Amino acid sequence: MFNRIFLFLLTNLAVLMLAGIVMSLLGVNPAQMSGLLVMAAIFGFGGSFISLLLSKFMAKRSTGAQVITEPRTPTERWLLETVRRHAQAAGIGMPEVAVYDGPEINAFATGANRNDALVAVSTGLLQNMDQDEAEAVLGHEIAHVANGDMVTMALLQGVLNTFVIVLARVVGGIIDSALSGNREGGRGFAYYIIVFALEMVFGLFATMIAMWFSRRREFRADAGGAQLAGRSKMIAALERLSLNHGQNTLPSQVQAFGISGGVGEGLRRLFLSHPPLTERIAALRAASGSAM
């Protein structure tokens, strides 16, 4: 975890330094630029990491997930035993296991680190999947935890937030100066309107980047689930999802780490956290064929 954080911070620092050089060549005041970079990094990473640290609490609160402390039914006992087996195989600490009330077939994982995670499944999943399929879904979620996807996505979001804040203000300042004829850095009311509009536009592009990365992580989590539970079980689980694919009612902060995502065509696909189920199934089958 700490190696990943160090690498992301180092990368972010290098890119921000490059941005500072470029902006200085464009005539942006270096003193103002330094303050802007610091402010952007604080707000960009601050919000992202606060969300990460509160992710388990917010997920439980928003879904009404009930953590299983003492199993009361054979199903709850099986859930705990399966998650424990997958966690041991993946080399991570035992996550909390919870069930939340929801008709859709879904599950999610969240948490600030690999050894303090939460894995939750919907009642719809327990009612509509057999144990082999559910085992594969749990393997998929454990793979998310083992791969450190929650931390990685928080770091990526921090980098993107930082760039949105910086670029919106730098470009907004240049546009405002050009429109007003003021080259001394004065700020009129129009500047704040321009910055707000640019943050919306750049934010859309940042979301596309984050969702593209999330889709890549889904393929990797599918492969991890196949390794933990078996490739045929993982394929069967995804096929079951494709037959019972409904609206994703998970809260936005955990949708990226669920087993099931939304459906969309055209531009909408750019904002999906999950690849189409057909592509995920095809990837698993292709990997199975190449391994033979």
From Swiss-Prot:
Its EC number is 3.4.24.-. One of its GO terms (biological process) is proteolysis. This is Protease HtpX. Its cofactor is Zn(2+). The gene is htpX. The keyword Nucleus does not apply. Zn(2+) binds at H140, H144, E218. Binds 1 zinc ion per subunit. Keywords: Cell inner membrane, Cell membrane, Hydrolase, Membrane, Metal-binding, Metalloprotease, Protease, Stress response, Transmembrane, Transmembrane helix, Zinc. The chain crosses the membrane at residues 5-25, 34-54, 155-175, 193-213. It is found in: Cell inner membrane. It is an enzyme of class 3 (hydrolase). GO terms for cellular component: plasma membrane. CDD domains: M48B_HtpX_like. It holds the Pfam family Peptidase_M48. InterPro entries: HtpX_protease, Pept_M48_protease_HtpX, Peptidase_M48. It comes from Xanthomonas euvesicatoria pv. vesicatoria (strain 85-10) (Xanthomonas campestris pv. vesicatoria). One of its GO terms (molecular function) is zinc ion binding. The active site is at E141. The lineage of its organism: Bacteria, Pseudomonadati, Pseudomonadota, Gammaproteobacteria, Lysobacterales. HAMAP family: Pept_M48_protease_HtpX (MF_00188). The keyword Disulfide bond does not apply.
